[in-house]
């Protein structure tokens, strides 16, 4: 499955628009990790537990988008976007794009 943030795919022609695909995941933060992250934010640096949670969320959302696009008969998703909303103890990641059928552009062979 091709997934791209652009509206076009290099070397491919979009032959059919199948429709919008969306997916979201809401995760709660672990209280112990939240405390450690709070301490880390005081001294600076990457909050690795949050980074891991976000990467896991993104992977799950992408897998769901692919499943939904495949059910529509698509072989690509264009215009892919992600939005993150962080609450006090939760975060929600939403992914959406347009499921399409894309075919390779046939080049004419020189004579």
Curated annotation (Swiss-Prot):
Phylogenetic classification of the source organism: Bacteria, Bacillati, Bacillota, Bacilli, Bacillales
One matching Pfam family: YbjQ_1
Tree of life domain: Bacteria
Family: Belongs to the UPF0145 family.
InterPro entries documented for this protein: UPF0145_dom_sf, UPF0145_YbjQ-like
Protein name, entry field: UPF0145 protein RBAM_010660
HAMAP family reported for this sequence: UPF0145 (MF_00338)
Cross-referenced Gene3D superfamilies: Hypothetical protein apc22750. Chain B
């Amino acid at each position: 499955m091709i997934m791209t943030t652009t509206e076009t795919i290099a070397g491919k022609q979009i032959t059919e628009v199948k429709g919008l695909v969306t997916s979201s995941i809401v995760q709660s933060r672990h209280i112990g990790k939240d405390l450690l992250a709070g301490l880390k934010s005081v001294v600076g640096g990457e909050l690795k537990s949050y980074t891991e949670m976000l990467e896991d969320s993104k992977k799950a959302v992408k897998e769901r988008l692919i499943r939904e696009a495949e059910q529509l008969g698509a072989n690509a998703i264009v215009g892919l976007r992600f939005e993150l909303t962080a609450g006090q103890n939760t975060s929600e990641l939403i992914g959406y794009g347009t499921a399409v059928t894309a075919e390779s552009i046939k080049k004419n062979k020189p004579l």
